[in-house]
Amino acid sequence: MLNEFKQFIAKGNVMDMAVGIIIGAAFTAIVTSLVEDLINPIISLFTGGLDFSGLGLALTEGEEAAVFAYGNFIMAVINFLIIAWVVFLLVKMVNRIKEMAENEPEEAPAEDPGPTEKELLMQIRDSLAKS
């Protein structure tokens, strides 16, 4: 499943990308809350109170110093991975449904029932009449 996820991220058709954009936009608030309110506190618990959102490197000194805020980037990456995983699962489900629909056996055409009883009797009569 992880290899399929890697392949999905590495390549995809336009439909996959469209689904990703739509689902990503719809789940942005939910995923952001998930990361900020649930995942980060758990990570913080195991890292001794480390908060990713506050991580950064001050490039200059002063009140309005330029900051290289790599903590926010880490949070954005986590958000992206969660959204991409959800989209991957959705596309995988859609592909499975399409595959099941394609593999459904089509109704076999009705077999030729052959001549009716009346037709058979007529053939026998004609054969007897010729002899």
From Swiss-Prot:
GO terms for molecular function: mechanosensitive monoatomic ion channel activity. NCBIfam families: mscL, PRK00567.1-4. Keywords: Cell inner membrane, Cell membrane, Ion channel, Ion transport, Membrane, Transmembrane, Transmembrane helix, Transport. PROSITE patterns: MSCL. PANTHER family: LARGE-CONDUCTANCE MECHANOSENSITIVE CHANNEL, MECHANOSENSITIVE CHANNEL MSCL. Belongs to the MscL family. This is Large-conductance mechanosensitive channel. The chain crosses the membrane at residues 14-34, 71-91. It is found in: Cell inner membrane. Gene3D superfamilies: Large-conductance mechanosensitive channel, MscL, domain 1 (1.10.1200.120).
